[in-house]
Amino acid sequence: MAANISIPEFYNGQSIFLTGGTGFIGKVLVEKLLRSCPGIENVYMLCRSKKGKNINERFEEITSSPVFNLLREQNPQALNKIILIEGDIAMLEMGISKTDQEILKDKVTIVMHSAATVSFTEPLKVAVNTNLRSVRELICLAKDMKNLQSFVHISTAFANWFELNVKEEVYPSIYDPDDIIELANRLPDETLNKITPIFLGKHVNTYTFTKSLAENLVKREKNLPTIIIKPSMVGASVSEPHVGWIDSLMGPARYIYYTTQGIFRSVYLPNRSAAIDFVPVDFTTNLTIAAPWKCEIDKRTNSSMTYPYIYFSATGSVNQLLWKDYFKNSRDFGRTIPPKNAIWYPQIRLHKTKIGHHIDVALTHFIPAYLNDLVAKIKGQKAIFDE
């Protein structure tokens, strides 16, 4: 392979196996791959039945999303390159049939593992099976792929958030990932939930705990061409597939949405100079696509490469946005271009003390919400904030 080959040229004839293709990052990743790398052979996308819809119904729903509008305009036939693989990452062997496993082993050249549960309150067993065991199952499958060039695992920049200066490396865990997987699936749920805080240690939730362990799983596979992508909080796009595109109220988008609506009015922010670290989704997906290209070029020029390649997709100390400015900008945006369903005039107060914040929440969140729902019930209307 020539050292000056372009990224689209690199993807000519490649077959991708993608997990998490139905999620926020996954949809943008699929769209970008099919639109910018038209020579791709196929994208095998893991998908499960959900909420009474089978995988084909979910596929129709997902591909009708506005995220694919530009692709449909430029190259509508590209969507035919998506081949659904029924499965569930939380299951053993990811719930993939033996027949489909053989297809993947024979055809796939690049694995992109984006699927995860990003809930901070997930029980340990659920988080382990979804974020950790799935990586082990996928690695086992990837080892038998005849033409594998890259194994890309999307982790998080916060996997070891408690380290003072986080470097592009995998930090060793005091636990063996296999032991945690066995323990989580052997102990009764009640017992496991009681001892979860002991295992978490410095980790504040099961999300970062399992993500850190998953990185250790990837690192130990010395003979696999592994890549770890570590995004911080992922927000709306800068330009692709559309300016400001987002379809999820996770992370930073949630704060913007509720602040502009006038619902979110008080924030506990003891450190006014604290920076918020989040990146546009198209930055993260572009990095995910470019990383296998870089890995393959390096393999051609360096016979002593060490894996995994690790890339952060984060702001860090460059072009920082402070939390205080983030909330004020959201407030000002809501005042300038108010949403149609705004509840109240946008206002936000930043508190250095918890007591001040709690008082403000009671006065501007709970009491108004209760009165609003009370009036709605009297009128025979549906309460909005009851939940």
Residues covered by each model-derived region:
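Residue-level signal for the nucleotide or nucleotide-sugar donor/cofactor binding architecture
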Residues: T130, I276-V279, L321
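N-terminal Rossmann/SDR dinucleotide-binding element
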Residues: M1-T117, L124-K125, R136, M145-S150, ...
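Mid/C-terminal beta-alpha module of Rossmann-like enzyme folds, strongest
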Residues: A291-E387
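A conserved pocket-lining segment of Rossmann-fold NAD(P)-dependent short-chain dehydrogenase/reductase
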Residues: N193-H203, T226, P231-E240, G244-A291, ...
